[in-house]
Amino acid sequence: MVSIRPDEISSILKQQITDYDQSVSVSNVGTVLQIGDGIARIYGLDQVMAGELLEFEDGTEGIALNLEDDNVGAVLMGEALGVQEGSNVKSTGKIASVPVGEAMQGRVVNPLGQPIDGKGEIPTSDTRLIEEMAPGIIKRRSVHEPMQTGITSIDAMIPVGRGQRELIIGDRQTGKSAIAIDTIINQKGQDVVCVYVAIGQKSASVANIVEVLRERGALDYTVVVSAGASEPAALQYLAPYTGAAIAEHFMYQGKATLVIYDDLTKQAQAYRQMSLLLKRPPGREAYPGDVFYLHSRLLERAAKLSDAMGGGSMTALPIIETQAGDVSAYIPTNVISITDGQIFLSADLFNSGLRPAINVGISVSRVGGAAQTKAIKKIAGTLKLELAQFDELAAFSQFASDLDEATQQQLERGKRLRELLKQPQFSPLNLAEQVAVVYAGVKGLIDEVPVEDVTKFATELREYLKLNKSEFIEEILKEKKLNDGLEATLKEVINEVKSSMLATV
């Protein structure tokens, strides 16, 4: 017979009372009614908020977008192969956030901030909301510092300033991404953090861009966010906001940042797909009514912060793809109206051999003039006008048989200016090299050089300056001004290079 010991029973009861966990966990749970095409209809989730993160049974995450009377429409951020009708869904009470910080530089991540480059986890504990309010008026100051792209035609005629939104627009295969990549490469040594967002692109293209950046030492200060063509529409829609959040972290630390959205046409198409599947009413070109807000809330996050806020900046270069040069379509006109200017790339100019194929006549920078360096502003003032007039005269001269001497001279000057502005890919020029090249063309110092030799002349001029006049380059890079002494030196060098070149022709 086992004896019952009261003290033992008492201690067991006390232990159980002590260990009793009386906390109650309340979770907001729903049931999947319907699933397909990356969209789930969920019954329940009465307490869910718009934009709240949801967690499905198999670990897939989603975002609640449509809050209707009897169900919730959510988009899935993954394949969701384990989700089916009747699956449980839990609201998390959180809004989508992404890891940020120094450790992100040099990495390739997906729109959720997860690494996809095979280099392991990213050692950072900082996070930031993907959707963040843009800085208010008081927190900003006007654009006043240059963001050098290294591309002469842009820095001279369509200058971009830190904190500006400059649209790159053109048909497919006209060199839009090339301009963006060149701009990233040109930030080497400038203490600028770059974020390249690839939306709906082929994985091979993104891998190629990453390799180009690595070869040129630009990946060290760049974060690549990739939502490939095979990714769900929800991830393609989120990718630009993720890029903006990563850049914002550095901007609020007082750093200069550059974000490239390549391209926002595909983001709008992904959003249209999601909206139509969620049965939102379609508008023009079947886009939903809030597609303008989709891009405006993204691009308004680019800013030049006031000194009180640390003086950081986020420069945005959104890219838009047009169909047969039609800039009056819905998305192009929306983004043109949001941004501070546009660089228009022409397929005709591209096919005629002009690279970068910038159409100077309809390209403009609305605020960049205030940020342009004095050295290039002084000499490039007439360049845009001369090239625009040349384009008109060139079209007119095809129909006119006898042209007066002044018109012929203007045509010849225009041909040489256009040749001077040709620039191979991945070879950005510094300020001093740009000043030298533009000065030679605008001042008419190369009018005697044959048109076919102008590109060769520009290369020789840059080489001569590097080898024999390094102090000229250093002075311009330091002072950012072209004084009378430097101008005399430059004129002398140009004439010397021209004479030696003409002697061998």
Swiss-Prot record:
Gene3D superfamilies, per the entry: 2.40.30.20, ATP synthase alpha/beta chain, C-terminal domain, P-loop containing nucleotide triphosphate hydrolases
UniProt cross-references to Pfam families, sorted A to Z: ATP-synt_ab, ATP-synt_ab_C, ATP-synt_ab_N
One GO CC annotation: proton-transporting ATP synthase complex
Assembly, per entry: F-type ATPases have 2 components, CF(1) - the catalytic core - and CF(0) - the membrane proton channel. CF(1) has five subunits: alpha(3), beta(3), gamma(1), delta(1), epsilon(1). CF(0) has four main subunits: a(1), b(1), b'(1) and c(9-12).
Encoding gene per record: atpA
Function: Produces ATP from ADP in the presence of a proton gradient across the membrane. The alpha chain is a regulatory subunit.
Species of origin: Prochlorococcus marinus (strain AS9601)
Binding of ATP, residues: 170-177
Membrane topology: Peripheral membrane protein
Positions bearing the site annotation: Required for activity: 363
Transport recorded as keyword: yes
Assigned protein family: Belongs to the ATPase alpha/beta chains family.
Catalytic reaction equation(s): ATP + H2O + 4 H(+)(in) = ADP + phosphate + 5 H(+)(out)
Enzyme class: translocase
EC number in record: 7.1.2.2
Lineage: Bacteria, Bacillati, Cyanobacteriota, Cyanophyceae, Synechococcales
The protein's name: ATP synthase subunit alpha
MF terms (GO), sorted A to Z: ADP binding; ATP binding; proton-transporting ATP synthase activity, rotational mechanism
Keyword Aminoacyl-tRNA synthetase carried by entry: no
Location within or outside the cell: Cellular thylakoid membrane
Keyword field: ATP synthesis, ATP-binding, CF(1), Hydrogen ion transport, Ion transport, Membrane, Nucleotide-binding, Thylakoid, Translocase, Transport
Major subcellular site: membrane
